[in-house]
Regions:
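Cys/His-rich Zn2+-binding cysteine-cluster or related metal-binding knuckle/ribbon modules and their
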Residues: 2-8, 17, 30-83, 88-92
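Extended interfacial segments that mediate partner engagement and assembly in macromolecular machines
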Residues: 26, 75-143
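S-adenosyl-L-methionine-dependent methyltransferase catalytic core, i.e., the SAM/SAH-binding region
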Residues: 8-17, 27, 33-36, 76, ...
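Signal for well-folded cores of large energy- and translation-related assemblies
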Residues: 16, 34, 49, 62, ...
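Residue-level signal for pocket-adjacent positions within structured domains
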Residues: 28, 43, 56, 68, ...
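Conserved phosphate/pyrophosphate-binding and hydrolysis machinery centered on Walker-type P-loop NTPases
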Residues: 19, 38, 51, 63, ...
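Long C-terminal interaction/binding lobes of large macromolecular proteins
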Residues: 129-198
Length: 198
């Protein structure tokens, strides 16, 4: 038996499609949204549509931005000769919070996972290799320490080694299987400072 009206059930169903949101959390969010003032709901809906329509990939590093170049790639104060490779834009934000990394990034938007059918062509490796045609001294691989992250790191290392560009991997300290988004800034900073050559 369905306890809710079709509109509430549909809202719960749509919210539960979001990552990390189960049916109970979706229900709480749905009722919160329904009880919000109409203007706030309209603003939320407009913001979602606006973000979806205007956010795109930075033409250089592939992070999400609303401009052609993200603020990091557009900055002349950043070290454009050092590129940190991360799985997604959330991990870029995690490293930025340390305030200690002054290079630029490359966002893969995924990791190699044969079990899930994700191969090298499914992530942004082509764009990374194109960037390496420019003036780059070092690539820091900061993918997750999961099996997929390690597989991706080794694959990238093998691609880059023939170019003569220095390749390093963030140090451990980031727990195996740990999600970088939830690692504190000090641990991330130590992992970055203790990176090793591959």
């Amino acid at each position: 038996m369905d306890y809710y009206s079709s509109q509430i059930s549909k809202l719960i169903e749509e919210l539960s499609r979001l990552p990390g949101i189960g049916a109970k959390s979706a229900g709480r969010l749905a009722f919160h949204i329904i009880n919000m003032p109409k203007e706030q709901v309209e603003q939320l809906a407009a913001t979602l549509v606006d973000a979806r329509n205007n956010v795109r990939y930075c033409k250089q590093c592939c992070t999400l931005t609303d401009k052609e170049l993200c603020p990091i790639c557009a900055s002349e104060e950043r070290d454009h000769k050092t590129i940190m490779v991360v799985d997604n834009s959330r991990y870029l934000a995690a490293y930025e919070k340390t305030g200690k990394y002054n290079g630029v990034y490359h966002v893969l938007h995924g990791a190699i996972s044969p079990m899930l059918g994700i191969g090298p062509g499914d992530i942004r490796l082509k764009e990374l290799m194109e960037r390496l045609q420019g003036d780059v001294d070092e690539v820091i691989i900061a993918t997750n320490s999961s099996l997929e992250g390690e597989t991706t790191a080794m694959y990238i290392s093998k691609l880059i080694k023939p170019t003569g560009i220095k390749v390093s991997r963030i140090a451990s300290g980031v727990p195996v299987g740990g999600d970088l988004e939830y690692i504190d800034e000090v641990t991330l900073l130590r992992a970055l400072e203790g990176r090793t050559a591959l």
